[in-house]
Each structure stands twice: as C-alpha cells, then as structure tokens.
Regions:
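Canonical positions in the second alpha-helix
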Residues: 50-51, 84-85, 118-119, 152-153, ...
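Register position in tetratricopeptide repeats
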Residues: 37-38, 71-72, 105-106, 139, ...
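Helix-start (N-cap) detector for alpha-helical repeat units in TPR-like alpha-solenoids
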Residues: 25, 59-60, 93-94, 127-128, ...
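Structural marker of alpha-solenoid helical repeat scaffolds
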Residues: 54, 88, 122, 156, ...
Length: 477
C-alpha cells in the first residue's frame, strides 16, 4: 500500500472554509487535517464525522470521511460512506478509487474492478487507480488486462519499480498459460522441445539445451532459428524438408505467443535489476528465480532480504513458507504462514497453505477450521477440497471425503493421487463401481505421466504453480 500522506495530498479536498464562517467548524477541519498528516486516522475519522453530521449534503466532505475510514482500516464503513458521497456527486474521483481499494482489501476483486475502472475513466493519468486496477485484474486472473494497466503505469511513472515488477509477473503468467496451451495442443511437437531448450539455455545448461534443440530440429527442420540454435551450441542441424503434416499452425502461434510473453517478462525484470539493483523488488526477482531453479535455501535467504527491506510486503512470508514446506520443515513453515495471515487475513490461498501445514503437523481440528474458512473466501484454491478430503478419509468419514475429492477433481482432473484417494473413499462406502472407476482413472493418468516427454516434464515444472509435497512434514524433525 502506498503511504497514506501521498494519497491524501492528491485526493482530499476540504472546502469548509468557503461554506461556513463557524470557528468551531474550522477548528474541527484543521484538527482533521492535522490528524491525517501525523497518520492518526482514528482522530481524523472522529473529526470528519463531526463535520459530516453538520454538512450531510457535502459530497467532498463525505469523501474525506470515507478516505479517513479507509486508512483506519474500517473498509466496510468506508464503502458505505463513499456510496453516500457518490449519490451526491457521481463524478468525484476519490470515492470510486477508494471504494475499489477497499473492496480489494476485503478480497473482493469483482466488486473492486468496476469502481477502479470508473476511476481510470475519470482520470486516465491517475497512477494509483491504474496500478490497483492492474492488481485487481490479476486477482481475477485477467493477466492481459493487467499487463496493459501496468504498462501504462510504467509510461506515466517510469521510476515505479513496483509497476515494473508487476508487469513482469503479468507477462510471466501469460507466458505460462500459453506454454500449457502449447503442451496440450502439441505435447511432443518441435515447438515444445524448442521452448524447453530455450528455458534450459537461460539457466545456463548448454548440454541439456542442445539435446532439446536437436529434438526440436528433428521434428521441425523447416525452422531456421532451430538450426542456428543447434549449431551455435556445437550440434549438427538437420536440414531435411519437413512434411506438411508435421507443421501445426496452432503450435507455431502458441509458441510465438509464449516466446513473446517470456521476452516481455524478462525485459521488465531486467529493468528492475538495472534501475534499482538494491531494491526489495530486485531481491524478490532473484528469489523467484531460485525457486524456479529448485534452490530453496537460496530462495529463502533472498526472500528474507526482501523482508528486511520491506517487512509488510504481501506474499513474501507465503513464499518462504512454501519453500520450507518443500524442504520438509513444517513447523518453521507454520510460523511464516501465520505471519502472512496477519498481512492477508482474507486470502484464500494463504488460509489453504496454513491449513495444509496444520494437517502435516497433525493439528487436524485447526486445519479443518482454517480450510473451511478458505472455502468461504474469494476464489478458494481447489486444493482446499483435496486437503479436506484427505482429512475426512483419515477420520474414516468416507462420504465427506468423497464429496470433497470429487469437487477437487472437477477442476484438477489429472491428479492421479487424488483419484487414488477417491477410490479409497468409495471402498469405505462399499461402492465398488465408483471405486473401480476411480482406480481406472488413477491407472490411466499414471501411465500418461510415464509417457510424457522430457520436454513436457521440463516445461510443466518451469511453468507450474509451486507444488508442496503433502508428505514432506513427516520428514521434519
């Protein structure tokens, strides 16, 4: 969140002196402004409430009260006050902007987006409105729209390192999604091998990169840059003509989109590293890179540097906790997720990770409460249902286990382990037909996994969400 005083200076108007000669009113107005300047929003709220009761039809005064409530973390009350301000003057910027921010703080991006879009329409050059509209789009998984907003912010405010980082993250996610689409459209095609080779080359693994480029070149000898990539790494390129059947236009399109997104992401991150090499965002970029390279110890160290520079940055304790879980250090991870929960109490993903960690530590009742809370929040991860399914299976509550696992598998159809757990639930229910179906799905998906190519496995690892082994906690001291 940006510093309160920066926002106040840009958005608050206090027209009271022109509207009344009352010395008492002026005194309360001055007290409100003084409280804002020193960050005492509790007092500012009290002063603005006094003024608003005496000038209930003043839209700007209602807006000022709403902003004070917002910075006092009274988001629901702020929204109600902003609504009143907008009924008096629908074209005020601050009520739309801060209503959107309040909904975002309440983890309600669907409600935040329309307000922030209106704020941008009212003032297209407002950096704050565009930045948070971008974040709200990210929360909705609308990454292309988010990238457009962050790109505009970097144009309006070239020194805004947060916007450059967010832009890189948006393009990274766009590239990830295009890569997954490529793997679905042509899992063993030349472009998948090419993309895997490029990723390995970026990591500095020339030998594996060459092997992947040779596989790609063998499948698509018609692509000049593939021949060049093979030869540049010391290999011998294939120059035989490719058959028309080997050319997949969709494959080429998806590769081009994934490649372009990756380049744009890298350019944004490189800008951060060049413009602000000692910033918390630069250290975050390095930490994220260590995660992709499966170097969790280095990632944790880099993330801790981020926290030294900006202790209240959301997502960092979560990232450390996830890395600790992957290392089998569940007790330490619990501390990190609890710290993250203080920063993001309404985050479904944080609550789900906390619930998973509690399960690993054998704190089943706490885990259940946390996971059920996650399911009541905005866009809960499907994993919450999987974890509840495992918990209910452990309790021999087979019906509840089957219900939760089926909800999980409705979206995560290729999780072989979940199908196996579901078969156990149906066995407990003496439902042989459903048990056999679940086992057949388990066997099929397991065989499909064995048949996956090296390129598929490499790209899936690089482009997947960070995965935590549920059994990791059992190995912790």
């Amino acid at each position: 969140m940006l510093a309160a005083q920066l926002v106040i200076a840009a958005s608050m108007v206090l027209p009271l002196a022109a509207q009344t000669s009352s010395q008492a009113m002026a005194s309360h107005a001055e007290a409100a402004q003084a409280a804002e300047k020193r960050g005492d929003f509790f007092t500012a709220v009290r002063e603005y409430e006094y003024l608003a009761r005496r000038l209930p039809r003043n839209a700007e005064l209602q807006s000022n009260l709403g902003v004070a409530l917002y910075f006092n973390h009274q988001w629901e009350q702020a929204i109600a006050v902003f609504h009143k301000a907008l009924t008096l003057d629908a074209n005020l910027l601050a009520p739309h902007l801060f209503t959107g921010l309040a909904w975002y703080q309440l983890s309600r991006p669907d409600a935040a987006v329309p307000e922030l879009e209106t704020a941008v329409r009212l003032r297209s050059s407002d950096v704050l409105a565009r930045t948070w509209l971008g974040y709200a789009y990210v929360a909705q998984s609308r990454y292309e729209a988010a990238a457009k907003e962050f790109q505009e912010v970097t144009r309006l405010a070239p020194d805004n390192i947060d916007a450059w980082y967010a832009l890189g993250q948006a393009w990274l996610e766009i590239g990830r999604r295009r890569t997954l689409a490529l793997l679905k459209a042509a899992p063993n095609g030349g472009r998948a091998w090419q993309l895997a080779g490029e990723q390995l080359q970026l990591q500095g693994d020339r030998n594996k990169a060459l092997a992947d480029y040779e596989q790609a070149n063998a499948r698509r000898p018609d692509i000049p840059e593939l021949r060049h990539a093979v030869e540049e790494l010391g290999g011998k390129a294939v120059t035989a003509p490719v058959t028309q059947a080997a050319v997949n236009p969709q494959e080429d399109t998806l590769y081009a989109q994934a490649h372009e997104a990756e380049q744009k992401s890298r350019a944004a991150f490189e800008h951060v590293l060049s413009a602000a090499p000692d910033s918390y965002r630069a250290h975050q970029i390095m930490a994220d890179a260590y995660v992709l390279q499966q170097q969790d110890d280095k990632a944790i160290a880099a993330y801790r540097t981020v926290l030294q520079l900006k202790p209240d940055l959301p997502g960092i304790h979560e990232a450390i906790g996830s890395a600790l879980l992957r290392s089998g250090k569940s007790a330490e991870a619990l501390t990190e997720f609890q710290a993250e929960l203080k920063l993001q109490p309404r985050s479904a993903s944080v609550n789900t990770l906390l619930g998973q960690t509690l399960l690993l530590l054998g704190k089943n009742d706490e885990a259940e409460k946390t996971l059920r809370s996650a399911l009541l929040m905005d866009r809960p991860p499907a994993d919450a249902h999987r974890l509840l399914g495992k918990l209910e299976l452990h309790r021999n509550n087979y019906q509840a286990a089957a219900e939760n696992l089926n909800r999980y598998l409705a979206t995560e159809k290729n999780d072989a382990t979940a199908w196996y757990l579901l078969s156990r639930a149906y066995r407990g229910l003496n439902d042989k037909q459903q048990m056999d179906h679940a086992l057949s799905q388990f066997a099929k998906i397991s065989e499909d996994a064995k048949a996956r190519t090296q390129a598929q496995n490499e790209l899936a690892r690089l482009n997947s969400q960070t995965h935590v082994d549920d059994e990791a906690g059992k190995r912790s001291p």
